[in-house]
Regions:
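N-terminal amphipathic alpha-helix/helix-capping segment at the start of soluble metabolic enzymes
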Residues: 1-21, 191-195, 248, 303-316
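Glycine-rich, proline-tolerant flexible connector loops at the mouths of alpha/beta enzymes
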Residues: 24-26, 50-77, 205-212
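Conserved anion-binding
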Residues: 20-22, 59-60, 118-209
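N-terminal small/glycine-rich loop or linker at the start of catalytic domains
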Residues: 4-30, 62, 79-80, 137-171, ...
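Conserved, mostly hydrophobic/aromatic
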Residues: 18, 44, 48, 93, ...
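Alpha-helix-loop-beta-strand connector modules within alpha/beta enzyme cores
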Residues: 64-101, 129-139, 181, 219-234, ...
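C-terminal helical cap(s) of enzyme catalytic domains, especially alpha/beta-barrels
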Residues: 127-128, 285-312
Length: 316
């Protein structure tokens, strides 16, 4: 398997979202057959996706638990079909260890765990055994389940991770501190299971049980993840707080209209530009071409010292 050395020197990588679910908030039901999913995978790769993130269970507000075997039946045939014809990096979006094991054996490279190894006590061991890379997400829904922004989400994890006393203390923490309280627990689990540090990426959990203000504050905190020595895996594409911001600014956001749908992706791409200007390693997105352009601008800012001193007369 791989380690995070594939991140070095490549700039920000684009991770294309491929949901093989009937109920995901953006593309649910579109790619539930292997043929449809494979066709979309080819399209994403052709457009420039360097990673494909394949999910078999929706995590949107109001979604429902998917049984382990059903989730395996959704993702594994798609992973096998993609792997037959491409060496693209494949991430499986799951918090269940049995799904992760089946996906890794089918050819996946990365486990994208929205519970940060805390939802399934066997997950970290599976990742270590397969020498896979992992994305550990800060999950505010698990960290403060009684918060109004959390109660609209499904329950993540097989059993409670934090005691009621811990949850009471965590409920008082500023969101930036809460993120690190959660990550400290996740990273301790990873270390205990033997997952190598250089195989771990951290995801600040944008859009999961957070207020608009908290989402924005966490985006301001991206640098602290780098300061701790971890690469960042960021997912902001089509998140509700993004839509809310541009809606309040007077822009059309109704996804049933062509303009509204476009504006959602355009606004998301602006955040990709900001993120890449801060050196974020991976962005998880729906629209690859739009985010590819945005990332090229952000990356140019991040690598300003390496830019050529092209004068005005030399511009094309």
């Amino acid at each position: 398997m791989i380690d995070n050395k594939w991140l070095s020197g490549q700039g920000t990588l684009l991770c294309g979202i491929l949901n093989v679910t009937p109920d995901s908030f953006s593309d649910g039901g579109k790619y539930t057959s292997v043929d449809a999913a494979l066709q979309q995978a080819r399209k994403l790769i052709q457009e420039g996706a360097q990673i494909l993130d394949i999910g078999g269970e929706s995590t949107r507000p109001g979604s429902h638990y998917v049984e382990i075997q059903e989730e395996i039946d959704r993702v594994v045939p798609v992973i096998k079909a993609i792997r037959k014809e491409s060496d693209v990096l494949i991430s499986v979006d799951t918090w269940k260890s049995q799904v992760a094991a089946a996906a890794l054996e089918a050819g996946a490279d990365i486990v994208n765990d929205i519970t940060g190894f805390l939802g399934d006590p066997k997950m970290a061991a599976v990742v270590a055994e397969h020498e896979a890379s992992a994305v550990l997400m800060f999950n505010p829904v698990m960290a403060r389940p009684h918060h109004p922004s959390s109660t609209i989400f499904p329950r993540f994890g097989f059993e409670p991770v934090f005691s009621e006393q811990e949850l009471q203390q965590m409920a008082q923490e500023p969101i930036q501190d809460l993120m690190w309280t959660f990550f400290d627990r996740s990273l301790a689990v990873a270390k205990a299971a033997g997952v190598q540090t250089d195989r771990i990426m951290l995801d600040p959990g944008i859009g999961f049980g957070l207020t608009k203000r908290e989402n924005l504050l966490l985006l301001q905190e991206l640098g602290t993840i780098h300061q701790k020595g971890y690469p960042i895996f960021l997912g902001v594409s089509r998140k509700r707080f993004v839509v809310n911001i541009i809606e309040e600014a007077g822009f059309e956001t109704d996804p049933a209209t062509e303009t509204g749908f476009w504006n959602r992706d355009l606004a998301s791409s602006h955040l990709t530009s900001i993120a890449t200007s801060q050196g974020v390693e991976v962005v998880r997105v729906h629209d690859i071409p739009l985010h590819k352009m945005a990332a090229s601008l952000g990356q140019a800012i991040f690598q300003a010292q390496e830019a050529a001193d092209t004068n005005l007369k030399q511009y094309k």
